[in-house]
Amino acid sequence: MNSKLTALIFLGLIAIAYCGWINEEKIQKKIDERMGNTVLGGMAKAIVHKMAKNEFQCMANMDMLGNCEKHCQTSGEKGYCHGTKCKCGTPLSY
């Protein structure tokens, strides 16, 4: 039960950070308080960091909100999501 609650809190913190209400540093501190310096805590912190630096909302090679496409319109190229990164004019090769 405790692990399910921790996972639920973790997902809630990611959702709040994604909306921009709190920053990555505060979430990292909460993870340290709840999980400590464990392997699972390190994995959770890595996921939060990856989500926080995702500025165009590319998730799993999909442009969910069209932000990558909008970003690349300034250069006149099509936007492609590569994992969580947006690349203009570079389609996926796989």
Curated annotation (Swiss-Prot):
One Gene Ontology MF term: toxin activity
Tissue note: Expressed by the venom gland.
Superkingdom of this protein's organism: Eukaryota
Statement: the UniProt record of this protein carries the keyword Membrane: yes
Major localisation: secreted
Listed GO CC annotations: extracellular region; membrane; other organism cell membrane
Pfam hit, one: Scorpion_toxin_alpha-beta
InterPro entries given in the database record: Long_scorpion_toxin_alpha/beta (IPR029237)
Location of this chain's protein in the cell: Secreted; Target cell membrane
Record domain BetaSPN-type CS-alpha/beta: where: 55-94
Function description: This full-length protein shows antibacterial activity against B.subtilis and K.pneumoniae. Also shows a potent inhibitory effect on the ookinete (ED(50) 0.7 uM) and gamete (ED(50) 10 uM) stages of Plasmodium berghei development. In addition, induces cell membrane disruption, leakage currents and cell death on HEK293 cell line (tested at 25 uM).
Note: Negative results: does not inhibit potassium channels Shaker and Kv7.1/KCNQ1, when tested at lower doses than those inducing cytolytic activity (18 uM).
Protein name: Scorpine
